[in-house]
Regions:
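Glycine/small-residue-rich loop that forms an oxyanion/phosphate-binding "nest" at active or ligand-binding sites
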Residues: 67, 79-119
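Intrinsically disordered, low-complexity terminal tails and inter-domain linkers enriched
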Residues: 18-35, 232-249
Length: 266
């Protein structure tokens, strides 16, 4: 089995891949997934939870991981002492066959690289555009020849709603939940619809721009807010790559892209 660890600023996502994993399907991708909240006080708790998972699954032979920000010393020491193969994804040292066009790879989030690697593990002969909708929205592009062209970062949904409230005198703070018609019929729906539909058109605009240059590009939507923007998506349950030919209206949704990318490391 392979354990992947996606270590973010406030949480870690641990995903187990069994030997029977079918790379192209979603349903049986992960034998087990755990989301662990962590901060400077609970790093030891994170290590303890990781130790518990390793004890429960003694056949884990490989750990592939990536981290955003500072890696807890306790975790580093723990991983160094493990008898199994441990591999960290670093944008400054990409896997064989991958080249980085980002001018400052040391500032590139490893999870962003892992996500495009995960998308390309599903469609190895396609250019892939990964849109990760979380606190911020990231757009990352990996060409079919393995060249990471770069990416953009845009404010996420909650950030946009809060910014309109904090940087104006009279606009209220609205939540993302609620009516969001194409055209707002009052101030609350105008703010919410402006943010949600603005992101919708932003995402669709990026996809159209990339596909104009790379017609074989497939787009992937991931992240906690991936279903909030009125975008029609399909799961990654396709039999083979020929079943996933990019079209103007085909976008795949997958929550395991980062884990898939780590699992695909050579």
């Amino acid at each position: 089995m392979t354990l992947t660890i996606d270590l973010g600023n406030t949480r870690a996502k641990l995903t187990l891949f069994s030997a029977q994993t079918t790379a192209r399907t979603t349903g049986n991708t992960a034998a087990q997934t755990a989301i662990l909240e962590h901060n400077s006080v609970t790093h030891q708790h994170l290590v303890a939870q990781l130790q518990q998972m390793l004890e429960q699954h003694s056949n884990i032979q490989r750990i592939c991981w990536c981290a955003v920000g500072t890696v807890p010393t306790a975790l580093t020491l723990f991983l160094e002492d493990l008898p199994c193969h441990v591999q960290q994804l670093l944008p400054t040292s990409p896997p064989a066959g991958i080249t980085i066009g980002y001018r400052t790879p040391e500032t590139l989030g490893a999870d962003r690289l892992a996500a495009v690697l995960g998308a390309q593990s599903l469609l190895p002969h396609h250019t892939v555009l990964v849109i990760d909708a979380g606190t911020c929205i990231t757009f990352d592009l990996l060409r079919s020849d393995g060249h990471y062209l770069g990416g953009n970062i845009s404010p996420g949904l909650d950030m946009r709603l809060k910014a309109m409230h904090h940087h104006t005198a009279r606009l209220p703070l609205v939540t993302a939940q609620g009516a969001h018609p194409s055209w707002g019929y009052d101030t609350l729906t105008a703010l919410r619809s402006g943010a949600i539909w603005g992101i919708h058109h932003e995402i669709m605009g990026y996809i159209a721009q990339v596909r104009a240059k790379y017609p074989n590009c497939c787009a992937f939507l991931t992240g906690g807010n991936r279903y909030d923007f009125n975008i029609s998506t399909q799961t990654c349950n396709f039999a083979d790559e020929s079943d996933a030919i990019a079209t103007d209206n085909r976008i795949f949704a997958d929550e395991y892209l980062v884990a898939r990318g780590l699992y695909a490391l050579p």
